[in-house]
Amino acid sequence: MPEGPSVRKFHHLVSPFVGQQVVKTGGSSKKLNPTSFQSLWLQDSQVHGKKLFLRFDPDEEAVSLGNSLLSEPLREGEQKDKARHHQEASDPSSWSPGGDSAVPSGDDGLQCLGGDTPAGGAERWLQVSFGLFGSIRVNEFSRAKKANKRGDWRDPVPRLVLHFSGSGFLAFYNCQMTWRFSSPVVSPASDILSEKFHRGQALEALGREQPICYTLLDQRYFSGLGNIIKNEALFRAGIHPLSPGSLLGLPRLEALVDHVVAFSADWLQGKFQGTRQHTQIYQKEQCPAGHQVVRESLGPPGGFQRLTWWCPQCQPRLSADEPKQLQPS
């Protein structure tokens, strides 16, 4: 799945089409009928963690009518969600990881109403969640780089193609799309690429007793962080992926957060400059020091297991009886 920097790049590609009308559609999507986008206007584009949100509206007269018909329960629900997320972002002490409102691990805290088709006149946002090789192409289609398992050189088929009034088009590949009938309500405090990323909230989450590699992938606290960033940040901080966060001193946790933010920002900058991000441990057989790298699938019991690379020498595992003050810095 594309991580935060990649989805930010997709958002950058889509932004020039905001304000244009869809004049032609295509694609293989079965869940969403591509023709349902015909004549809609792309009015806004937002990115939150690993998800992209696109707002589509009919003409202004229809939008005005739809907003006036929006039910009061829906409006009240949106206001409550916005108020709660604002409180969490401004006052981390009000946030409770064990409360009933907690979002399951792996969710990035988005609160929306969903469905397969847009309600007439209601505010409609298309939520785009990308698969492992998900992407967006502008004014071009993806071409096969190698033969498939059957030996065919077939080009990938886009899920959705939108041609706009400005003569350009967008092609969406390997993604899931769902209509949302209210604005995405999120807390930028959890977005690792946001200027409002809340380090204190992140450090509190990392200090748990569970293996630190589990916490890093929890989108409630590190929205946009994926497997590549996880592996690279842990290696650069010299932390074993299975080390419980509670055994790590604050300086090491702060260093880990620094590496998460720095690596993510460098990756994003490279995306815009067209350069490939350099990795030191991800998918490597040896670390930069020449040590043999271990690869293993790690994840919470009953949860999703992710391939993890680490160097046993550069990232020694901590024992429960090791005093924090004696841990390597």
From Swiss-Prot:
Its EC number is 3.2.2.-, 4.2.99.18. The gene is NEIL2. The zinc-finger domain is important for DNA binding. SUPFAM superfamilies: S13-like H2TH domain. Involved in base excision repair of DNA damaged by oxidation or by mutagenic agents. Has DNA glycosylase activity towards 5-hydroxyuracil and other oxidized derivatives of cytosine with a preference for mismatched double-stranded DNA (DNA bubbles). Has low or no DNA glycosylase activity towards thymine glycol, 2-hydroxyadenine, hypoxanthine and 8-oxoguanine. Has AP (apurinic/apyrimidinic) lyase activity and introduces nicks in the DNA strand. Cleaves the DNA backbone by beta-delta elimination to generate a single-strand break at the site of the removed base with both 3'- and 5'-phosphates. PANTHER family: ENDONUCLEASE 8-LIKE 2 (PTHR22993:SF29), FORMAMIDOPYRIMIDINE-DNA GLYCOSYLASE (PTHR22993). A zinc finger (FPG-type) spans 280-316. This is Endonuclease 8-like 2.
